[in-house]
Amino acid sequence: MLISVCIPTYNRPKSLLNCLNSLSLQTDLDFEVCISDNCSHENIERIIDPYRKKLNIKFNKNKENLGAALNFLKVASMAKSEFIWFLGDDDLLFPNAIKELKSLININKDCDFFWINS
């Protein structure tokens, strides 16, 4: 697997739902999704479960709130792919986003880092 999409989240189930929906509509589904919940009061796993059939999801719920920076590091540590794409739980992707990113990676084989700002 080439890409891990890493999503730190905290108490934003509606935003995460929309983000996961946009990921499930990708034209290329060969990627993993890593989600680290920073001890939300909401049942975030309930939001994730319906997407497990279509997406390769890894989920972590912190036992206590670690703060944004440590939750960011936690979700990164879950990734097993060559490249990590950090998404906010409120980010939405066009359906061809993963496919386009893979094309960029394949064209620029000597790059170790891509900055995407949309």
Roles of regions detected by a PLM:
Residues 1-118:
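Nucleotide-sugar donor-binding/catalytic module of glycosyltransferases
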